[in-house]
Amino acid sequence: MIEADRIISPNATLQEDSQDRAIRPKRLEDYVGQPQVREQMEIFINAARGRQEALDHTLIFGPPGLGKTTLANIIANEMDVSIKTTSGPVLEKAGDLAALLTNLEPKDVLFIDEIHRLSAAVEEVLYPAMEDYQLDIMIGEGPAARSIKLDLPPFTLVGATTRAGLLTSPLRDRFGIVQRLEFYSVEDLRHIVARSASLLGVSIDDGGAHEIARRSRGTPRIANRLLRRVRDYAEVKADGAITNEVADKALNMLNVDLHGFDHMDRRLLLAVMEKFDGGPVGVESLAAAIGEEKGTIEDVVEPYLIQQGFLMRTPRGRVATQAAYNHFGLTMPE
């Protein structure tokens, strides 16, 4: 199974990108959750606007699905400027970046998603652009080649990444503002579900919103995806209104349990507990036992189970915790 097949995947599909655009908050006042980030960005943006300057370059990092792209667009809206959007893998050559930079208006936002995937050649062009608002361009080839400097308007680079540790130090050090997005609380997700339902014209009560929120793995993107699927269920099996009971039945049908685990999570935990006596078990043996690739287990399944305290990664292998045994109603071996 691949990540995109899972309803609780935090990664967006192309269809979801366009669907989510309609329900994304446009202003900080509509942005739910991340109170520290929201408070800080409000101060930084108001200060920059008061000085009539471009906002400092901003790095946003954290797990997928938490709203990095949304926050980048909010920054542009609050600064009342345009935003140009691209991603690290798309910028293959220095010329690709130069074309974007030379088309920016003063104070505009350039948003680079997956910025950790920029090539070294593109990064070299980015350094003087970020630091001095200058673009170094080579004209000609061989002995006749010469470098010219182009002045750029002051702009704001907003970089987003799920893997901040892969950023080079010179690039990371050039960001004046660094924000980490954390997983959302159930209460914040409940507000997000209720807001999205209102924008989508879906009838939902507090119980229904709470049921979806608590199974959304702390991730707004998953919450909005589950809301759409529960809406489908409500329209066919109920009267179109989402209550706690309707949400519970719909999510059970979708194999998403009370902790937001799907069949893949449960299969891994049960394999550790039942086939390997709770562990420790090596990831290769575990992969063979459940018929998944080692990389899928390490990158897709394990992180959330470890973060929630159901699985431990030790030098000797994976170990199921007491919480895992409690979840399945099993007795932990002595």
Swiss-Prot record:
Belongs to the RuvB family. One of its GO terms (molecular function) is four-way junction helicase activity. Its main location: cytoplasm. Has 3 domains, the large (RuvB-L) and small ATPase (RuvB-S) domains and the C-terminal head (RuvB-H) domain. The head domain binds DNA, while the ATPase domains jointly bind ATP, ADP or are empty depending on the state of the subunit in the translocation cycle. During a single DNA translocation step the structure of each domain remains the same, but their relative positions change. Its EC number is 3.6.4.-. Mg(2+) binds at residue 69. Keywords: ATP-binding, Cytoplasm, DNA damage, DNA recombination, DNA repair, DNA-binding, Hydrolase, Nucleotide-binding. Residues 185-255 are annotated as: Small ATPAse domain (RuvB-S). Gene3D superfamilies: 1.10.8.60, P-loop containing nucleotide triphosphate hydrolases, Winged helix-like DNA-binding domain superfamily/Winged helix DNA-binding domain. The lineage of its organism: Bacteria, Pseudomonadati, Pseudomonadota, Gammaproteobacteria, Oceanospirillales. PANTHER family: HOLLIDAY JUNCTION BRANCH MIGRATION COMPLEX SUBUNIT RUVB, PTHR42848. HAMAP family: DNA_HJ_migration_RuvB. This is Holliday junction branch migration complex subunit RuvB. GO terms for biological process: DNA recombination; DNA repair. CDD domains: AAA (cd00009). The keyword Cytoplasm applies. The RuvA-RuvB-RuvC complex processes Holliday junction (HJ) DNA during genetic recombination and DNA repair, while the RuvA-RuvB complex plays an important role in the rescue of blocked DNA replication forks via replication fork reversal (RFR). RuvA specifically binds to HJ cruciform DNA, conferring on it an open structure. The RuvB hexamer acts as an ATP-dependent pump, pulling dsDNA into and through the RuvAB complex. RuvB forms 2 homohexamers on either side of HJ DNA bound by 1 or 2 RuvA tetramers; 4 subunits per hexamer contact DNA at a time.
